[in-house]
Amino acid sequence: MWVRVARFEGGTAEGLETEMARSKQVLEELGSGGLPPGLEGVTRVMEAINRPEGTGLAVIFCDTEEDMRKADEALNNMSPPAEASGRRVSAGVYEVMHDKDMA
């Protein structure tokens, strides 16, 4: 399993809330209608925000390195979200070594 972690900084609490609502709607629509080119191999999306700091994370999961390479390329070519939700300051790809549900 592979993940891409993108970090966003410089957002406002209101801007982050707006972006998360928009993102949730887009993800729900994509889940029923297919993913954009390059993102077909994405198996899971997780987003997190820190309102007081104005930061956020987007974690994208793929099963294979090839699918992640395609997703990373597609995501790098997409426009970052609006200024109020922060700017992307980093994005990296990682191989998952351990994934254990502790519940």
Q: Which ranges hold each PLM region?
A:
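Short S/T/G/P-rich N-terminal loop/turn motif that feeds into the first structured element of a domain
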Residues: 1-57, 63-77, 83-103
